[in-house]
Amino acid sequence: MTDASPHQSNFAVIPAKTETQGSGFSAASMGPRFRGGDGNKAKRSGLPTLLQRYAPLLLLALAWEVVSRLGLVSPAALPPLDKVGAAWLNLAESGDLWTNGLASISRGAAGLGLAIAIGSAIGVAMAWHMPIRVVINPIVQFFYPLPKSALIPVMVLWLGFGDASKIVLIFVGCMLPVTLSAFNGARGTEQVLIWSARSLGASRARALWEVVLPSALPELLSGIRTALAFAFVLLVASELIVARSGFGYMIGWLGDGGVYDAMFAVVLTVAVLGFAADRGYLMLVRRVLAWRE
């Protein structure tokens, strides 16, 4: 699709510091999965544990249904979950959900992938080379507090209404936390480890690869998790404003058309995808960092 007009549609349906021992990096933001501890507790599983873990979500869904059914709020403002589910099925059967979902996932994956690759390299280079740090660090610190959604008009002005503006926006927004986490992780490597490697004949490149990067990995993975959340936020925000496809476009168009049950269906789809991506990432990280336990 082209991005010429934000109010046309082809839809079939109308009407989100714990110090690890022996290192200077932080893994607090990744939660307890990053830390060692009681191995028996870490391995506990089963239905009771799952119910306890996700009970707040079940209670939220129950409260939603009760409030909607009792008429405490307008059904248009908060449709019953069965109507939301029916609208989701209609969107899925028509193919609109999958087509727009693929467009969103492609943009998000492209921007996040570039951010991880380039941000990691820049962060480690800042920690490893003082001249690079002197040049790059002020730029990163200056732009980090800026709300990245404020860059949407700038990206449209520079890159137009196509996918490029959205991908670059996600790239910029996600690269900053990745860069800072890679920098902090690499800079926190104990100097005695680097000196020991060098005294044993390791070159600077080998010391970087075999000492600094493994030491920086937990902090870097923490930053990537933050970037993953940023990617969802920036993706939907940009598609709400300047897109003719994607989840954000669907939410905006369905909301403007008063199809609130379908709008909530798309919102919940994005929420579930974000939650699943975060849980899947934590499982991957737990495997990657198994050597630390």
Feature map (PLM): residue ranges:
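Periplasmic/extracellular loop-to-transmembrane helix junction in inner-membrane transport proteins
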Residues: 45-46, 70-116
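Generic hydrophobic transmembrane alpha-helix motif, especially the helices
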Residues: 141-177, 184-185
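Short cytoplasmic-facing helical segments at TM-TM junctions of multi-pass membrane proteins
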Residues: 181, 185-226, 247, 251
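Intrinsic disorder/low-complexity segments
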Residues: 1-47
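Transmembrane-helix boundary motif in ABC transporter permease subunits
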Residues: 110-140
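C-terminal transmembrane helix and the adjacent membrane-cytosol boundary/short C-terminal tail
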Residues: 130, 187, 218, 222, ...
